[in-house]
């Protein structure tokens, strides 16, 4: 009985070691996800996304879903989610591009997207304020695209 337990424990240790070694060598497509999720850009985006989700939870009891505050928070969160999808699509060989600066650009662009959304709800597309907001968003999109190309 003791001999069987020792064999079982040895097999479990060997199995755990092989799983750990496979994770360390990065076999399969999980390597890319691990390196992307440990990048400074991902951390920056995740930090802002978490802050927004916490704000939505905190304001949920005080504001309705149709309130301006909730609409703006959700617009910024949606922009971050779209950007996060793009970041997760980066090839593992290009994770060096995922710097903190890129993360800050993406977070700032999400805030500008929310401003543009607010402007579009108030004014027409041709209004000077809306055009200004659109140009800001376009500048940040161009900077992000330049880094990721």
Q: Positions of the model-derived regions?
A:
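Bacterial N-terminal signal peptides that target proteins for export
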Residues: 1-9
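Outer membrane pore-forming secretion/assembly proteins and partners of Gram-negative envelopes
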Residues: 2, 72, 79, 92, ...
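Bacterial N-terminal signal peptides
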Residues: 9-18
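Boundary at the C-terminal end of the N-terminal hydrophobic targeting segment
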Residues: 21-23
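Immediate post-signal-peptide N-terminus of mature secreted/exported proteins
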Residues: 25-65
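Long, charged amphipathic alpha-helices with heptad-repeat/coiled-coil character
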Residues: 31-36, 60-70, 82, 86-131, ...
